[in-house]
Amino acid sequence: MAHPKRKISKTRRDKRRTHYKASAPKVAVDAVTGEAHLYHRAHWHEGKLYYRGQVLIDNTEEVEA
């Protein structure tokens, strides 16, 4: 089984890891609701599930009088 011949120093290890950075998620604004949401994700707004400006699920309850 392969194993390292020498110990890699903390400095050398950390230099290698400088390129691994956290990036901020891409945020879109829905044209219909004006709600900010992640790209390619459906989002809830006032009891309705929206995706690309269309209502997918309508969970608003109508009160019968």
Swiss-Prot record:
Q: Which Pfam families match?
A: Ribosomal_L32p
List, in alphabetical order, the GO biological process terms annotated in this UniProt record.
translation
What are the start and end residues of every segment in region (Disordered)? 1-24
- Basic residues composition-biased segments: 1-20
Q: Which InterPro entries match?
A: Ribosomal_bL32 (IPR002677), Ribosomal_bL32_bact (IPR044957), Ribosomal_zn-bd (IPR011332)
Disulfide pairings:
none
Q: Where are the transmembrane segments?
A: none
Q: Ribonucleoprotein: is it a keyword of this entry? A: yes
Record keywords: Ubl conjugation included? no
Keyword field:
Ribonucleoprotein, Ribosomal protein
Q: Name one GO molecular function term.
A: structural constituent of ribosome
Q: Could you name the Gene Ontology cellular component terms for this entry?
A: large ribosomal subunit
Q: Which family does it belong to?
A: Belongs to the bacterial ribosomal protein bL32 family.
Q: Which NCBIfam families match?
A: rpmF_bact (TIGR01031)
Question: Which PANTHER family does the record cross-reference, listed alphabetically?
Answer: 50S RIBOSOMAL PROTEIN L32, LARGE RIBOSOMAL SUBUNIT PROTEIN BL32
- What name does this protein carry? Large ribosomal subunit protein bL32
**Organism taxonomic ancestry:** Bacteria, Pseudomonadati, Bacteroidota, Flavobacteriia, Flavobacteriales
